[in-house]
A protein has these predicted regions:
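Internal, charge-rich low-complexity segments
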Residues: 22-56
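Radical SAM enzyme [4Fe-4S]-AdoMet core and its adjacent flexible, acidic
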Residues: 9, 13-16, 43-46, 50-52, ...
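N-terminal active-site wall of soluble small-molecule enzyme domains
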Residues: 2-10
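Residues at alpha-helix caps and immediate loop-helix transition turns in enzyme cores, especially N-
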Residues: 2-3, 29-30, 134-138
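Flexible mid-to-C-terminal extensions adjoining Fe-S/redox cofactors in radical SAM and related proteins
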Residues: 231-362
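Ligand-binding grooves and catalytic loops that recognize ribose/phosphate and carbohydrate rings
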Residues: 35, 39, 63-64, 72-74, ...
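Short, solvent-exposed turn/loop segments enriched in Gly/Ser/Thr/Pro and often Arg
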Residues: 1, 22, 153-156, 277-278
Length: 362
């Protein structure tokens, strides 16, 4: 409930902000902003938003009322990104988040944000069951929406995630999360993706993910702060909290963590390759190799990939939008004739590719 105040405070400190979101309340926050700044100059964009079904008549009335205070809204800024969680195209993403319609809302929120003038990034986690070709199609589709960049990271079986997986989904972590070797196989083409799409992550980190080099973790470089204080040693693992960042730096024995020369100093670190630990290593020159500095300079200041308009051809809405969501499949199973259950005769299941076609599998 205090996210707006937090964002305004961080902006006053001159910080770059990524608002990580599942997209569900994003359009509401942007309507609040529009109401806070409304004047007649906004009418062309309001008309476009309404024509594109991104706001409705009720929203127009609210926006034109001009009620919210400017100090309590999230305004566009060159220092701020909406960072929308998207783990695949419609069928896959809705399945992972266990709620149909979320992908559609994410896309609507992204489109609305770009019309208003926000910067938008996406955040994707790759799991053992992730179809890499679908991730490429997802990037292509999102690029056609002129998303500004993408963060992508391997799923890692840290303690909180493992407990949630068992409790919420009834799945064993080893069936969902990846080993280091699996991560390298999934990310083998990440540098090719970076040529076509704007991938947020240093070239050195991308080489690490694809198995072309090793890096040591710099967990202290992207720290986590929550209501209990500075969390150590990292976002995934909690061995303690500290009142100040310097106190955390001084008191944590950083040599106890990470993987060095193939040896996991802490067993919890064994399969971790996530960006919050290793991406800063690429930026700071940890385990530096000849040419790394030039790679980073080119990445930060060189030309960026242009929007991939061909991505609009991807059939992104391949789930509940065409009545083939996971809940539709469950309803079909429940409503099957009793005879089919007794005889074992069933309609063949369908698997859906990222292009929206259906392949029959027996």
């Amino acid at each position: 409930p205090e996210i707006e105040k937090l964002v305004v405070g961080l902006r006053d400190q001159g910080r770059i902000i990524y608002i990580c979101t599942n997209g569900v309340f994003m359009r509401k926050k942007m309507r609040d902003y529009l109401a806070s700044v409304y004047d007649e100059a906004w009418e062309p964009k309001l008309k476009l938003l309404h024509t594109e079904s991104l706001i409705d008549e009720k929203d127009l009335v609210f926006i034109r009322s001009g009620k919210p205070s400017k100090s309590k809204v999230i305004a566009p800024s060159e220092w701020l990104y909406w960072n929308v969680h998207v783990d695949g195209l419609e069928y896959t993403h809705d399945l992972i988040v266990e709620r149909e319609g979320v992908f559609k809302e994410c896309v609507a929120a992204i489109r609305m944000a770009k019309i208003i003038g926000y910067q938008v990034a996406t955040n994707t986690t790759v799991y053992k069951e992730t179809d890499v070709s679908e991730i490429e199609d997802m990037f292509a589709y999102l690029s056609s929406l002129e998303v500004d960049g993408h963060t992508i990271s391997p799923g890692y079986d840290y303690d909180a995630a493992k407990k949630d997986m068992v409790k919420r989904l009834g799945k064993q972590p080893e069936d969902f999360f990846m080993t280091r070797q699996m991560t390298r196989e999934k990310f083998a083409r990440i540098q090719e993706w970076g040529e076509k799409f704007t991938i947020f992550g240093t070239p050195v980190y991308q080489e690490f993910l694809s198995g072309k080099r090793e890096l040591r973790c710099s967990a202290w470089a992207i720290p986590t702060r929550n209501i209990q204080g500075w969390k150590a040693p990292c976002y995934q693992m909690t061995d303690g909290h500290y009142n100040g960042y310097q106190e955390m730096l001084n008191k944590v024995d950083w040599d106890r963590y990470g993987v060095v020369n193939g040896f996991a100093r802490d067993s919890r670190c064994e399969n971790c390759m996530v960006h919050c630990g290793y991406d800063p290593s690429g930026a700071l020159g940890v385990d530096a190799e000849f040419g790394d500095t030039w790679k980073n300079v080119r990445y930060n200041f060189g030309p960026k990939p242009q929007p991939y308009h061909e991505g609009a051809e991807v059939q992104a809405f391949n789930g509940c939008s065409i009545n083939k969501g996971h809940l539709a499949g469950a309803r079909q199973a429940v409503n099957e004739p009793l005879e089919s259950v007794i005889t074992g005769e069933q309609e063949p299941a369908a698997s859906f590719s990222s292009k929206g076609t259906s392949d029959v599998v027996l």
